[in-house]
């Protein structure tokens, strides 16, 4: 589906399209100047990557190096789109890929391809329990978010490479993700938000002590990097970290954009000052 979507955007057949998963073995780059109605020309570089499989599933040297190139393409991208087949839903491999993209700190959106087929199935009466197509789509999106619960509220875009349905939304979403990643986060507001999250749901008591944050400041973008000056970094539990990330992203409006909390404990802070 990836190559078909790229070809639709490029209005060409430059990329090999096949029904056999894994046909693309190289990351193929193409520049695109898109004339948007009333908004001038948008410039993009599209990268159609090779699909990735887990190491123990890789069965050839070519595929191994294809995986490495895909990883490199992800690292250098401003926005990554994970393509899901509407007929299959979220697979285990999709979950693994989504986690890999998040680990690289890339902004991520979900593309549900072949949505025209899902719509036809609904209109044909094969699906029950939905009042209309919108309710069906909302339910489908909710199921995706449950399967990919660890993602930072990534946009979900329903498209069809075959018919061209909602294709421009891919480019609009890419522009939005790119712009969001340059958002400056005022230090005063950062500290109020982090303080509010800590107060709303205090960290767990561990041996009579809680994780505390004394001061917060933004130190980078792509991904957002937030320095937390705290008491003891080891008390920042994984579940609480996810809660803080979700609250942070929700307040500042950072859909699809990961956040990295960089923790500096009291002892480390004082040693730096010395």
Locations of the language-model features?
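C-terminal-of-GTPase-core extension/linker across diverse P-loop GTPases
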Residues: 1-47, 51-68, 72-83, 88-274
């Amino acid at each position: 589906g990836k190559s078909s979507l790229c070809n639709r955007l490029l209005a060409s057949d430059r990329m090999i399209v096949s029904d056999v998963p894994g046909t693309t073995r190289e990351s193929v780059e193409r520049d695109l100047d898109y004339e948007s109605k009333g908004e001038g020309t948008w410039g993009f570089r599209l990268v159609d990557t090779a699909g990735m499989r887990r190491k123990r599933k890789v069965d050839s040297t070519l595929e191994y190096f294809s995986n490495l190139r895909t990883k490199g393409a992800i690292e250098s991208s401003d926005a990554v789109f994970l393509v899901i087949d509407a007929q299959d839903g979220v697979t285990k491999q999709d979950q693994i890929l989504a986690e890999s993209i998040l680990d690289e700190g890339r902004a991520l959106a979900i593309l549900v391809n072949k949505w025209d087929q899902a719509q036809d199935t609904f209109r044909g009466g094969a699906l029950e329990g939905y009042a209309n197509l919108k309710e069906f789509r909302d339910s489908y999106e909710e199921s995706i978010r449950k399967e990919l619960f660890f993602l930072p509220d990534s946009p979900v875009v329903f498209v069809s490479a075959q018919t061209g349905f909602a294709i421009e939304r891919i480019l609009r979403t890419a522009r939005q993700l790119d712009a969001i990643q340059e958002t400056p986060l005022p230090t005063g507001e950062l500290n109020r938000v982090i303080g509010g999250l800590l107060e709303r749901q205090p960290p767990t008591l561990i041996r009579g002590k809680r994780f505390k944050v004394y001061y917060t400041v933004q130190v980078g973008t792509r991904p957002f990097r937030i320095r937390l000056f705290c008491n003891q970094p080891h008390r920042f539990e994984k579940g609480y970290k996810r809660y803080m990330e979700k609250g942070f992203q929700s307040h500042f409006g950072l859909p699809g954009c990961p956040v990295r909390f960089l923790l500096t404990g009291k002892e480390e802070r004082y040693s730096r000052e010395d």
